[in-house]
A protein has these predicted regions:
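Exposed, low-structure sequence patches enriched in small/polar residues
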Residues: 1-274
């Protein structure tokens, strides 16, 4: 699109997509390898509250330039191997962020972000191993801080308690990322801001769970933060700078649709178990 008039005059957005499939598996003709690529570029006027803001705690009147963003990413999907590979590169000029005082700032120079992610799921009889790994780099950590590596693993055993009536999952969900300057949060502003006071991460966060699918009802029990920072000597489980995540706790819930939902009532779902 292109904006011809108004406050957002000269704003535009261009997107292009390309994809194709190949069929290398003779025995699995309906399971191709898919290649997809996307290119996007846009020019956008900053939001009103990035330019002007008045409150008891914050006040600013800015004259920020338009934000230019260019993105190039691609995906390789191999369903037969339960494997997905994603890679992307983003270039942002005039990026707007919030500094250590939670004041809106604009970085005039271009900042680039590169990322590669891998999703691979394994299944051995009733054992499921769902894994995701992400590697990413920011050219300017003061403006766009990122953990270099982030990992999520969901391992569980799925089995029938009563065939076609009740199914159960028992397992754990683990998240981990390397040390980084996790953003702080300003309740008065309602925004996250960059901070250089303390690094967080390098500590696994583990939830144990049990999911039960009984006909249409899904019941879950979750033991939150079962590891309490294990195996690290010092626990480090913060969702933001100064905001600690829950310590050990139990959660119990039920999801019970009172009408049929195609694709939702056939097997155990993820309604809270990870």
């Amino acid at each position: 699109y292109y904006t011809f008039l108004g406050k957002e005059i000269n704003d535009f957005s261009i997107d292009a997509n390309m994809g194709f499939n190949i069929y290398p598996f003779r025995r699995y003709r309906k399971s191709p390898i898919s290649f997809n690529a996307h290119f996007g570029t846009n020019l956008k006027e900053p939001d009103y509250y990035q330019q002007h803001y008045y409150s008891n705690h914050y006040k600013w009147d800015n004259d920020f330039s338009k934000i230019s963003t260019t993105t190039l990413d691609g995906t390789i999907s191999i369903p037969h191997w339960k494997l997905n590979i994603d890679a992307g590169w983003t270039l942002i000029k005039n990026h707007i962020y919030y500094d250590g005082q939670a004041m809106a700032q604009q970085e005039a120079s271009a900042v680039s972000v590169f990322n590669v992610s891998l999703t691979k799921n394994f299944k051995l009889w009733g054992l499921h191993f769902d894994n995701q790994a992400l590697f990413q780099l920011s050219s300017n950590e003061d403006v766009i801080p990122l953990p270099m590596v982030a990992i999520n693993a969901r391992w569980y055993w799925q089995f029938n308690v009563v065939k076609k009536v009740m199914q159960m999952q028992i397992g754990a969900n683990v998240t981990y990322n390397t040390n980084w300057y996790a953003p702080g949060y300003s309740p008065a502003l309602g925004m996250f801001y960059n901070q250089k006071v303390e690094k967080y991460g390098n500590c696994p966060y583990i939830d144990a769970f049990v999911n039960i699918q009984w006909k249409r009802a899904c019941i879950f029990v979750k033991f939150v933060n079962v590891g309490m920072g294990w195996p690290m000597e010092h626990a480090d489980y913060f969702s933001a700078h100064g905001y600690i995540r829950p310590q050990r706790a139990f959660k119990l819930g039920i999801f019970w649709p009172f009408y049929m939902q195609p694709g939702r009532n056939k097997s155990v779902g993820n309604a809270g178990g990870g």
